Amino acid sequence: MVRLYFLKIGYAIINLCIKRFGVNYMGEIRSNPDELLRAIKNEDSYHKRGHLKIFFGYAAGVGKTYAMLKAAHAAKRRGIDVVVGYVEPHPRPRTAALLKGLEILPNKQIPYHNIVLKEFDLDAVIKRKPQLVIVDELAHTNAEGCRHEKRYQDVEELLKAGIDVYTTVNVQHIESLNDMVASITGITVRERIPDRVFDNADQVELVDIEPEDLIERLHAGQIYLDTQAQKALTNFFSIENLTA
């Protein structure tokens, strides 16, 4: 059973999540029951629309992407047509290893000054039309030249096209919880998703580890590179913030 540790950012946050969304016995936060009932009443539109599963955590490095990719392999074993649309590149060998055996679509290349940015290629996924696509970092802001400003808008278009989506997001990126997390950690996150995106998810899986284990991963270079890791340790990833 998944343990609900969210002591790291205060019991107030997890209690609010439970109150708003409900938690089943597997530790998965469910969508608002009224929202699901309304969708089920219109079976045609419900079955044509893609389903959204969010892997939900309290910080980078807790294992959201790892859990998402393991779930992708499980879906593939069940005969589901799965592709990887975008996975954030990080120095995490165990996570990178899980990309093996999955079809990976090329990123969209966007020239920006003297560099080339790599973004999720929405059109490539719609053209390929898999049953399930993996799209990391739901709160990401797209580069200029993409059809939508935010990645969650890309995901909404995929769902409307009847494609299921697995994605990841941290608690501080949810609009209504952002200020609460900022008051606990002292850090404001600019990239946010509207509550409705989270509310309308068909399934939300909590991914969590002890704060000491997370800091150990950070020290070991399993989350960020050295310079980023040191900065993170003195900001969001301080033990005071993670155990607040």
Q: Language model features by range: what are they?
A:
Residues 88-93, 139-140, 165, 171-176, ...:
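Conserved nucleotide-binding/hydrolysis micro-motifs of P-loop NTPases
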Residues 35-47:
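Pre-Walker A adenine-sensing motif
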Residues 137-151, 177-179:
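Conserved ATPase-coupling elements of RecA-like P-loop NTPase cores
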Residues 8-24:
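Short, positively charged and aromatic/hydrophobic N-terminal segments
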Residues 196-199, 203-244:
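C-terminal accessory "lid"/substrate-recognition subdomains
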Residues 51-120, 127:
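Conserved P-loop
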Residues 148-152, 181-196, 222-226:
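A short alpha->loop->secondary-structure connector
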Residues 81, 129-132, 161-166:
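Loop/turn-to-beta-strand initiation segments
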